[in-house]
UniProtKB/Swiss-Prot annotation:
Main location: secreted
Entry protein name: U-poneritoxin(01)-Om5a
Source species of the chain: Odontomachus monticola (Trap-jaw ant)
Transmembrane segments: none
Record flagged with keyword Secreted: yes
Organism domain of life: Eukaryota
Stated family: Belongs to the formicidae venom precursor-01 superfamily.
Organs and tissues of expression: Expressed by the venom gland.
Signal peptide: 1-23
Keywords attached to this entry: Amidation, Cytolysis, Hemolysis, Secreted, Signal
Amino acid sequence: MKLSALSLAFAIILMMTIMYTKADADASADAEADADAEAEAIWGALLGTLIPAITSAIQGK
């Protein structure tokens, strides 16, 4: 009986470890994707603002 209780405890700990590791990896991937999307949005806004200003400065307007 002690052996099956020990096996059950080990299985639960193993499952919790796997679930925690997977959740942590998913959260890291989501955070990285959010950071990439934010960087793309910033560069898009920056270039969208600067390119017309630079071209009008070059053209002398």
